[in-house]
């Protein structure tokens, strides 16, 4: 399952069936989080352009509000932006987010995932994450991806739930 628009000029996004590139990112409490530490359960990687921006806030709050339902799929949500951990801490506290928000402040992870948005709105030269979703299976393989070149477009949350449901039934 894939709904991908125009690929990044930096590197190509990984394909469905590929192993998700590992990362080691700081959370809002400055604790390092490795993707590989979460193997053994489905993961929803939710990359977003900027903390506290309107669409990003709506998206992360939608994940917050549906977390109990997602736990029914034994899924872990990880939000990832290029914002620093201190900004992500304020975002997490202001929005009462109940899942880790990770900081890709050096932009290495968005480059490895091929989801660099080279100019965020009028901020020429400010590289942010394209709004993107990767659903990973228990082994860390990508089973669903969605990437948007338009930062104003939210993901289809039903597609994400359907991808998780497929993982649960195939387990």
Region spans (language model):
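Chalcogenol-based redox active-site neighborhoods
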Residues: 1-171
């Amino acid at each position: 399952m894939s709904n991908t628009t125009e690929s990044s000029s930096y590197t190509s996004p990984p394909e469905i069936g590929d192993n998700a590139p590992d990362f080691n990112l700081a959370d809002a409490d400055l604790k390092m989080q490795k993707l590989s530490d979460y193997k053994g359960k489905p993961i929803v990687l939710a990359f977003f352009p900027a903390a506290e921006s309107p669409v990003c806030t709506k998206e992360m709050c939608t994940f917050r509000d549906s977390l109990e339902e997602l736990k029914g799929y034994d899924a872990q949500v990880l939000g990832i932006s290029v914002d620093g951990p201190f900004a992500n801490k304020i975002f997490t506290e202001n929005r009462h987010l109940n899942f880790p928000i990770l900081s890709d402040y050096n932009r290495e992870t968005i480059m490895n995932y091929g989801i660099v948005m080279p100019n965020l709105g009028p901020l020429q030269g400010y590289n942010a994450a394209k709004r993107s979703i990767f659903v990973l299976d228990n082994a860390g393989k990508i089973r669903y991806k969605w990437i948007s070149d338009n930062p104003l477009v939210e993901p289809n949350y039903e597609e994400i739930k359907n991808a998780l449901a497929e993982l649960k039934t195939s387990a």
